[in-house]
């Protein structure tokens, strides 16, 4: 069972698609670097929708898998 996505991953999922459409030949490592920089520059208020979605996913995950324990 996978862990639920955090706020960065929720936002990155959307942005990654946009970047891949604009630059289909860009390597995944470069896309990840750009996403990290964009996230760091994003204001706290702009992150709120992603934080809320991540929280919703976390709560759903807890309901779906009540005995889940993260084991790396």
UniProtKB/Swiss-Prot annotation:
Gene Ontology molecular function terms on file: DNA-binding transcription activator activity, RNA polymerase II-specific; RNA polymerase II cis-regulatory region sequence-specific DNA binding
Gene3D superfamilies: High mobility group box domain
Record-annotated DNA-binding residue ranges: 1-69
SUPFAM superfamilies, A to Z: HMG-box
Localization in the cell: Nucleus
Entries under InterPro entries matching the protein: HMG_box_dom, HMG_box_dom_sf, SRY-related_HMG-box_TF-like
Superkingdom in the source lineage: Eukaryota
A Pfam family: HMG_box
Key words of the record: DNA-binding, Nucleus
Any single GO BP term: neuron differentiation
Primary localization: nucleus
GO cellular component: nucleus
Keyword DNA-binding recorded: yes
Name of the protein in question: SRY-related protein AES2
Organism: Alligator mississippiensis
Taxonomy of the source species: Eukaryota, Metazoa, Chordata, Craniata, Vertebrata
């Amino acid at each position: 069972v996978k862990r639920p996505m955090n706020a960065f991953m929720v936002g990155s999922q959307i942005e990654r698609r946009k970047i891949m459409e604009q630059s289909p030949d860009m390597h995944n490592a470069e896309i990840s670097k750009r996403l990290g920089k964009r996230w760091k520059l994003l204001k706290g208020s702009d992150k709120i929708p992603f934080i809320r979605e991540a929280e919703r996913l976390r709560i759903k995950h807890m309901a779906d898998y009540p005995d889940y324990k993260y084991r790396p």
